Swiss-Prot record:
It comes from the Bacteria. Residues 38-256 form the Radical SAM core domain. It catalyses: (4R,5S)-dethiobiotin + (sulfur carrier)-SH + 2 reduced [2Fe-2S]-[ferredoxin] + 2 S-adenosyl-L-methionine = (sulfur carrier)-H + biotin + 2 5'-deoxyadenosine + 2 L-methionine + 2 oxidized [2Fe-2S]-[ferredoxin]. The gene is bioB. SUPFAM superfamilies: Radical SAM enzymes. Pathway: Cofactor biosynthesis; biotin biosynthesis; biotin from 7,8-diaminononanoate: step 2/2. This is Biotin synthase. [2Fe-2S] cluster binds at C97, C128, C188, R260.
Length: 345
């Protein structure tokens, strides 16, 4: 059975304090011990229910408390979701994440959510959902449907958390992660850089994640996307090197986890993204939109992959699907790039 290092905030801060090139070298060494450094997991994120969220997360345009111009939408039909998943798979994604702007899912929606999971799984894709807090029963129902991952971010350190969110406690988030893990679903949990937090808060977030009973299999690191109408719309820009440091420290502290470049990539140039991959990032969201905020379009991602010699990671599927994935990989990396589908529209 794998053993995990118990981290302290002081140890995490010591990593943040390292000279950048030394930190990158250490992170790359750790990355190569656990992953193929040329493989990048490609995921698609679809908003299956948008806006009108009762929570007060200060960074989020989906909160009903802020005037951001976002139009709310009801839960998508199962058939619509599966059609989006099919198109995402055809465009090269191997993992399909479905997000709903809820504090927690209603019982009346659970049968539809289960059908979405079952349908996407039938396509040979990994499944992920982010729906807010889950009860024990809800976690087990999603597990029975075949859900692979559940995303529930901690966002920041326990100390800074109350400055950003008051409608859900930090402990509630930890409780949901425990319910997900106990149900046999893999955990996806990370945070946001640029909320106004200190380096110590970033260290505290990573310590919380790394010291879970088992570290998350997937750790999304977001750069704040400032949205007009939210309380954080005038926050200072995130320094690219500080973001890269956070990726590198996450890689060192959670060596077996996928570290995902999530929201904020639209604000990063190619050089910053390349350094993030060098620092140990090995997963991206692929498509023009992450729920309600911009993301680089697919063509740009594939061009960057070609420049860096990176390959989209393939999932374990049937023989026929493996051949299809290989053909897609060749097409994406070496052929003319077609216009790909934006599943999040």
């Amino acid at each position: 059975m794998a053993t995990y290092h118990h981290w302290t905030v002081g140890q995490a801060l010591a990593l943040f304090d390292k000279p950048l090139l030394e930190l990158l070298f250490e992170a790359q060494q750790v990355h190569r011990q656990h992953f193929d450094p040329r493989q990048v997991q490609v995921s698609t994120l679809l908003s299956i229910k948008t806006g009108a969220c009762p929570e007060d997360c200060k960074y989020c345009p989906q909160s009903s408390r802020y005037k951001t111009g976002l139009e709310s939408e009801r839960l998508m039909q199962v058939e619509q979701v599966l059609e989006s998943a099919k198109k995402a798979k055809a465009a090269g994604s191997t993992r399909f994440c479905m997000g709903a702007a809820w504090k927690n899912p209603h019982e009346r929606d659970m049968p539809y959510l289960a059908k979405m999971v079952e349908g996407v799984k039938a396509l040979g894709m990994e499944t992920c959902m982010t729906l807010g807090s889950l009860s024990k029963q809800q976690a087990h129902r999603l597990a029975d449907a075949g859900l692979d991952y559940y995303n529930h971010n901690l966002d920041t350190s326990p100390e800074f958390y109350g400055s950003i969110i008051t409608t859900r406690s930090y402990q509630e988030r930890l409780d949901t992660l425990n319910e997900v893990r106990d149900a046999g679903i893999k955990v996806c949990s990370g945070g946001i850089v640029g909320l106004g937090e200190t380096v110590r808060d970033r260290a505290g977030l990573l310590v919380q994640l790394a010291n879970l009973p088992k570290p998350p299999e997937s750790v999304p690191i977001n750069m704040l996307v400032k949205v007009k109408g939210t309380p954080l719309e005038n926050n200072a820009e995130v320094d690219a090197f500080e973001f890269i440091r956070t990726i590198a420290v996450a890689r060192i502290m959670m060596p077996s986890s996928y570290v995902r470049l999530s929201a904020g990539r639209e604000q990063m140039n190619e050089q910053t993204q390349a350094m993030c991959f060098m620092a140990g990032a090995n997963s991206i969201f692929y498509g023009c939109k992450l729920l309600t905020t911009p993301n680089p379009d697919e063509d740009k991602d594939l061009q960057l992959f070609r420049k860096l010699g990176l390959n989209p990671q393939q999932t374990a599927t049937s023989h026929g699907d493996r051949e299809q994935q290989q053909a897609l990989t060749e097409q994406l990396l070496h052929g003319d790039t077609a216009q790909f589908y934006n599943a999040a529209v």
